[in-house]
Amino acid sequence: MAPSNLPPVFNATSQDIEMLLAAQCHLGSKNLQVHMEPYLWKTRPDGINVINIGKTWEKIVLAARIIAAVDNPADICVISARPYGQRAVLKFAAHTGAVAIAGRFTPGNFTNYITRSFKEPRLIIVTDPRTDHQAIKEASYVNIPVIALCDTDSPTEFVDVAIPTNNKGRHAIGLIWWMLAREVLRLRGTLASRETEWDVVVDLYFYRDPEAEENKEIEEAKVPGAEEVGAAAIESGLVGDSWEAQAAPAFAGAGVPAGAAPGWEAEGGVDWAASSAAPADTWAGESGNPDAGVKW
């Protein structure tokens, strides 16, 4: 990491650098946009562009200082059309007082004053300049400064402050928003000092898959050991190690000795064919005298 140009009080700690590396904030894409070249550290043999983490931290601090300079937190609008950043912007807005737009950005939010969702923010922060291009385009029409999380292949047109980071991973996006919120609270004085740990864990900013959470709740609600014994056995109460011991009393009550095992062979040498050989009426014999014994 290159030496930082920040005052010593703003220098990143070793824990901050470890978190940025663990969340893979330094891994960019294989494409490189010309304006993102100053933030490039090197290119790996497989073509992945590695971002300079020192530049990322400097831009986080710069963006936090810009956000803290806005008097009214409600004049800041945070936007994320990318699903991985929607939970992060909602948490950022809850902790800093900003206004969040999570999901689709309605065209005309910043330019069409007739719409109900019309807003006039003094600053907007977007998760991805490519997916949030509509918000950046409208901000350029009304002279709103833009802070954006930019990958190595992100377009930087109309972006005033670009935070170089991986903006496609759920952990990278959540961590950058968490660090940005923490720096804003430190500059506002909400956190007593820079040595004070923030009691909000970074996991709250991570994207969570609704289907995965639902499946997890279903797994936790299952009866322990239900898969081994079966659902029908749990309902009938026949749960145990020996099925023969539980089935013996039922056969004993039906006239079968308790120790005898039930079988399909007939007892006592019964011949089923002999019992079925009883004389049967023949229609041929009756057809010789059809009127015999018939009274109408």
UniProtKB/Swiss-Prot annotation:
Annotated region described as Disordered, given as residue ranges: 274-296
Domain of life: Eukaryota
One Gene Ontology cellular component: cytosolic small ribosomal subunit
Sequence ranges of Low complexity compositional bias: 274-284
Annotated CDD domains: RPS2
UniProt keyword list: Cytoplasm, Ribonucleoprotein, Ribosomal protein
Family matches, as InterPro entries: Ribosomal_uS2 (IPR001865), Ribosomal_uS2_C (IPR032281), Ribosomal_uS2_CS (IPR018130), Ribosomal_uS2_euk (IPR027498), Ribosomal_uS2_euk/arc (IPR005707), Ribosomal_uS2_flav_dom_sf (IPR023591)
Subcellular location: Cytoplasm
Main location: cytoplasm
Any GO MF annotation of the entry: structural constituent of ribosome
Assembly behavior: Component of the small ribosomal subunit. Mature ribosomes consist of a small (40S) and a large (60S) subunit. The 40S subunit contains about 33 different proteins and 1 molecule of RNA (18S). The 60S subunit contains about 49 different proteins and 3 molecules of RNA (25S, 5.8S and 5S). Interacts with RPS21.
Function: Required for the assembly and/or stability of the 40S ribosomal subunit. Required for the processing of the 20S rRNA-precursor to mature 18S rRNA in a late step of the maturation of 40S ribosomal subunits.
PANTHER family in the record: 40S RIBOSOMAL PROTEIN SA
Family: Belongs to the universal ribosomal protein uS2 family.
Protein name: Small ribosomal subunit protein uS2
Annotated organism of origin: Ajellomyces capsulatus (strain G186AR / H82 / ATCC MYA-2454 / RMSCC 2432)
